[in-house]
Amino acid sequence: MDTKMSEFLNEFMTAWNTHDVRAVTAWYAADCEDIDVARTRPQYGADSVRRTLVYYLRAFPDFQVTLNDAVVDDERAALYWTWTGTHRGTFMNIPPTGRRVTVRGSSLVTLKDGKIQRAVRIWDLAGLLRDLKLLPELTG
């Protein structure tokens, strides 16, 4: 893995896991495009990323993310990750349940001039809802 990309991933994951909103946001370009498949439309700008992070941390104050795998080139990274947390605040209009969740997902991140220009997240919303006991286990 390229040293610059390796440093980015290490610093980025550390910022997420220490809940350093300023450090996470600093990795995003001011005009970035942030796409989360669970949302109806993309978000634009580093401030929208900051608001999203604060929203997640209010809902899951013990939020932690593990980078399971990464495939990278000079300016792109495909990341497979798992995040965990305890549902202590309203999330997606779901009142706090106090339940622990484990969510798996992937991100495709594009860097430009050392900043995230575009991020696309695809994650297991059904798994989150199952952990919150709002969706039954799938059988068969």
Question: Across the structure, where does each feature detected by a protein language model lie?
Answer:
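C-terminal and inter-domain tail/linker signature
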Residues: M1-G140
